[in-house]
Every structure is written in structure tokens, then in C-alpha cells.
């Protein structure tokens, strides 16, 4: 642990890493935070995290780039509400970080994760709305309950314990923080997007469905078999030899 950063696993050569970012709004002693995930396969693992309430938005992109570079140039998805847009622009245009994830606004279909291609309706990160937050929190619940996301950090567990339902949304209790939880929510939204599945070759929803089907089948009583002797070859003067061959008498009509 150093200056707000905690490393749980050092980077390995081949895995795909994803960094999700929640930028402080500058109020109520808010934290700027990001989490680095090993997204190579499910269950996903948290390999590093950063959380600091003193860092300035103008300096934050340098820390984000340094750690993301360290983890095989991790794919970065930033929440661009408020000051997040400034951080995303700095990463893309000033620091020229290549692996920024872009999101496309698709009208009624909402926001869709994409690559790094600019165009109409594209933005350098995820704009957190009621819709995306609802999808993200629902996916996060499913990932945790099905053991598809391993959480090994005390600060994250602490924030999850105070992350409550309020009206039709979820947020931290009065006086608590949810910066790290929002990084989890962003990742959970991301993990169910088609582009993410193509990027990592992991369909976690399909795996969860298969696991559920296997559990149902395991709980079912096995099918029984009834031997009524009607199709028994030995009941028709036939028999099996020691080698497993079936011998039966040959029947034929007179004159054939």
C-alpha cells in the first residue's frame, strides 16, 4: 500500500486488464478512485486499486496512466459525469493513452460500449445515468452472488456494507462513501456489453446460466429404468457369450 494505492497481484504478460474510474466531484471530502481488474476469465479478480481524496483532477490522469500502463496497458473506462470528462480528455489528448474505452449513445437503446473510434454520439467514457446505474448494480449483485467476482479489499467491502437502496437508486449512507463501489458498478455494466465479451472472449452471463442449469439438474432425482423382460434377447432363447456377442436361434419359414 502506497499513497492510496494497493496492489494485490503483479501484472502477468498475457492477461487482459480493465481499469474503471470514478472521479471525485470535489465535494464532501470525496475520493477519486479506480480499480484494476483481471478480466481474462471469470471469476474476475481485483489486482489493484487506488483511492485518494487529496489528489487534484489535473494530476489524477498521470497516476491513472502510470498504473494502467503497468498492467499491460489496461483498457480504461471512466465515468465522465462532472470532472470525469476532464480526466478522460487529458488521458486521450494530452497523455495520448491508446486503450481508452468509448461509449456510444444509441437513443432508446441507451449507452453501448465500443472501441476507440470517434464518431457521432461517441464519448470518451460512461455517463452515469439512472438507467446505467440500475443495470450496473443489478449485474454487480449477480456477479457477487454467483462468485464471478472476487473482492479481496477491505475498503471495498466496507463501502459495500453501506451501499443502500434509496428510492429507485442506490447510493452510500449518510456520511459514507461509494467511490470504489461505483468502480465496481461501472465494471459490472461493462462486463455485460458485447464489445467486452469480444475483447476478453468471456461471456459471464452465459456461464452463470450454464452453472444454474447444472445446479438444477444436480438437484433433480435421477431417471429410473424398468426391466419388464419383453426385449430381453435371452428370453427368446438367445444368450450372450463371455465376449459379449449375442447368439440367437435362426427362424425361417418352410420353403424359403
Residue spans of the language-model regions?
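Intrinsically disordered, low-complexity segments enriched in polar/charged small residues
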Residues: 111-113, 132, 138
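A generic structural motif
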Residues: 48-52, 99-119, 123-124
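Acidic, Ser/Thr-rich peripheral helices and adjacent loops at domain boundaries
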Residues: 124-134
Amino acid at each position: 500500500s502506497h499513497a492510496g494505492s494497493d496492489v494485490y497481484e503483479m501484472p502477468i504478460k498475457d492477461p487482459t486488464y480493465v481499469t474503471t474510474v470514478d472521479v471525485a466531484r470535489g465535494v464532501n471530502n470525496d475520493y477519486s478512485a479506480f480499480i484494476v481488474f483481471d478480466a481474462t476469465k471469470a471469476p474476475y479478480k481485483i489486482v489493484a486499486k487506488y483511492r485518494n481524496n487529496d489528489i487534484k483532477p489535473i494530476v489524477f490522469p498521470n497516476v491513472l496512466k502510470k498504473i494502467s500502463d503497468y498492467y499491460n496497458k489496461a483498457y480504461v473506462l471512466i465515468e465522465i459525469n462532472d470532472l470525469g470528462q476532464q480526466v478522460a480528455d487529458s488521458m486521450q489528448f494530452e497523455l495520448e493513452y491508446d486503450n481508452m474505452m468509448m461509449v456510444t449513445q444509441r437513443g432508446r437503446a441507451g449507452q453501448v460500449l465500443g472501441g476507440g473510434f470517434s464518431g457521432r454520439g461517441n464519448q470518451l467514457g460512461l455517463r452515469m445515468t439512472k438507467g446505467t446505474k440500475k443495470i450496473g448494480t443489478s449485474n454487480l449483485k449477480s456477479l457477487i452472488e454467483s462468485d464471478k467476482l472476487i473482492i479481496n479489499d477491505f475498503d471495498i467491502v466496507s463501502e459495500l456494507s453501506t451501499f443502500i437502496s434509496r428510492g429507485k437508486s442506490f447510493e452510500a449512507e449518510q456520511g459514507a462513501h461509494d467511490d470504489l463501489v461505483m468502480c465496481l458498478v461501472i465494471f459490472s455494466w461493462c462486463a455485460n456489453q458485447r464489445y467486452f465479451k469480444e475483447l476478453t472472449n468471456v461471456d459471464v452471463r452465459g456461464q452463470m446460466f450454464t452453472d444454474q442449469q447444472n445446479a438444477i439438474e444436480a438437484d433433480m432425482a435421477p431417471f429410473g429404468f424398468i426391466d419388464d423382460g419383453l426385449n430381453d434377447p435371452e428370453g427368446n432363447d438367445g444368450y450372450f457369450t463371455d465376449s459379449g456377442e449375442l447368439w440367437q436361434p435362426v427362424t425361417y419359414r418352410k420353403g424359403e
